[in-house]
């Protein structure tokens, strides 16, 4: 995977954009992994995180049942399907269809959505992926607590849906109690 650094691209117009939006857009325009993801047909650069972890730990095996939480825009779902997995994915935001995957739109924290995920899986999941992030408020403590609460909810659900020996891959922003979460069973 090669991501050569191109010449710096500047934002042509900043009209109507906040400073943070301008910074994000400039970063996107100049990120070699964004360009590489587009060239390879992936929906987001985050696919390379999953690919690296899969290559290192052998997480995604052909035929495995995979639950993808916080799936939009769908690059992790795309990758898991490409690896031959049976994927059920959910996000608050709509997800463009991915051939071979079951996609749901809804709040993962809603018990009705959790029940539907279990039904759609058709059995225990071999791996649960979560690239979810709580909506940011800009207040560090509140954001950290929300992220930790979301991570705990993912782990609680993993205990319900994972097959014995199953894996849970969870993105968590470091801070506070986050150091305790990886030790959870």
PLM regions: where:
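Conserved SAM-binding loop of SAM-dependent methyltransferases across substrates and taxa
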Residues: 73-84
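Conserved class I S-adenosyl-L-methionine
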Residues: 62-72
